[in-house]
């Protein structure tokens, strides 16, 4: 399900409106690697603050400056150009001197830190991101205040943002054409985008159905449950439901929904039947990820922002800060707060 307006809200549809982003400075994203760089090694980590530049462009410029092939430059996640972001890039430079990046001139970008590291930075290496947003022209301060408090206590749906599906859902449109053999997709990056969009749409559809049935916080027989903060999961057995529900309520466990691939969904019994029913209508996308032998995975249905705080600058402007784990979308938080005049989706 790619249209965010069709997705169910956890706290009911917001009544307030506002502007998510008037300037790039109203959307600040700072990467959290989750580890301290080693200080030595074959890799050179470069922390860059960028405005108006997308991740791939900066990677290309760093490669050119350091006289490296583009394949020698990596990063942990993509960041949108319509924001101020602090992001790490990794340059593979064995046996080479660390470049003097003080002479790098790139409009909208500043090098903040350079340090050696032993391991390559790869997609998904990231622990999470710190977000600092400013919501302006808020129509109802009391409503937004109450919803922010609800979110801090109870979380939000862990939906993929519309950015995942491309402009006007183009990635999904192309994925369906590809699935039906109406087009050929040779570029590896496009194949990845289309497959990712397909799985994300199916996840959103199952997660939304779970919320619609008031079952986002109720363990079903056969559910795939994730240990909070961990990627591993296990299947809920019928004789364990009461105990598992207590652990879920205590925050130790999270219910997951599928990122379908070429194998089974992972759930069993009641949960499997629910997910298969929820995926009705997505046969084309499901057949594509099976055909392309994509590895299946699971993702938590709910997202719990950490370190959440907010401060009103005046009656119509609120600054909101929080931390999200890698792969989560800040706009999944914002869509539970208010209807935004601009839908800027920045995840990592």
Swiss-Prot record:
Among SUPFAM superfamilies, the record links this protein to:
Pseudouridine synthase
Q: Where is the active site?
A: 80
Q: What class of enzyme is it?
A: isomerase
**Would I find Metal-binding among this entry's keywords?**
no
Q: Which InterPro entries match?
A: PsdUridine_synth_cat_dom_sf, PsdUridine_synth_TruD, PsdUridine_synth_TruD_CS, PsdUridine_synth_TruD_insert, TruD_catalytic, TruD_insert_sf, TruD_pseudoU_synthase
Q: Does the keyword Cell inner membrane apply?
A: no
What is the purpose of this protein? Responsible for synthesis of pseudouridine from uracil-13 in transfer RNAs.
Give the protein name, as stated in the record.
tRNA pseudouridine synthase D
Q: Identify the gene encoding this protein.
A: truD
């Amino acid at each position: 399900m790619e249209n965010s307006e069709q997705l169910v809200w956890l706290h009911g549809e917001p009544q307030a409106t506002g502007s998510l982003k008037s300037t790039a400075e109203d959307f600040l994203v700072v990467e959290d690697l989750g580890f301290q760089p080693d200080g030595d090694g074959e890799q050179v980590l470069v922390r860059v603050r960028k405005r108006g530049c997308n991740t791939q462009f900066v990677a290309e410029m760093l490669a050119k400056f350091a006289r490296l092939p583009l394949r020698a430059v990596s990063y942990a996640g993509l960041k949108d150009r319509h924001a101020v972001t602090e992001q790490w890039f990794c340059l593979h430079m064995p046996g080479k001197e660390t470049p003097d990046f003080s002479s790098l001139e790139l409009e909208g970008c500043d090098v903040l830190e350079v340090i050696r590291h032993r391991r390559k930075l790869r997609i998904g290496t990231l622990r999470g991101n710190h977000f600092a947003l400013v919501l302006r022209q808020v129509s109802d301060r009391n409503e937004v205040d109450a919803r922010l408090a609800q979110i801090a206590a109870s979380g939000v749906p862990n939906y993929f943002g519309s950015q995942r599906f491309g402009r006007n859902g183009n990635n999904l449109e192309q994925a369906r054409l590809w699935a039906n053999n109406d087009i050929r997709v040779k570029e590896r990056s496009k194949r990845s985008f289309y497959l990712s969009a397909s799985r994300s749409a199916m996840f959103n559809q199952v997660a939304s159905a779970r919320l619609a049935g008031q079952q986002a916080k109720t363990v079903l027989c056969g559910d795939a449950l994730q240990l909070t903060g961990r990627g591993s999961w296990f299947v809920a057995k019928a004789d364990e439901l009461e105990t598992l529900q207590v652990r879920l309520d205590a925050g130790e466990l999270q219910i997951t929904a599928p990122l379908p691939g070429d194998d089974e969904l992972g759930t069993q019994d009641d949960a499997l039947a629910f997910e298969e029913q929820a995926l009705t209508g997505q046969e084309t996308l499901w057949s594509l990820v099976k055909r392309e032998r994509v590895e299946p995975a699971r993702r938590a249905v709910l997202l719990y922002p950490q370190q959440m705080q907010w401060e009103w600058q005046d009656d119509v402007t609120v600054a909101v800060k929080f931390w999200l784990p890698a792969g989560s979308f800040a706009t999944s938080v914002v869509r539970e707060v208010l209807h935004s005049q601009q839908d800027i989706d920045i995840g990592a």
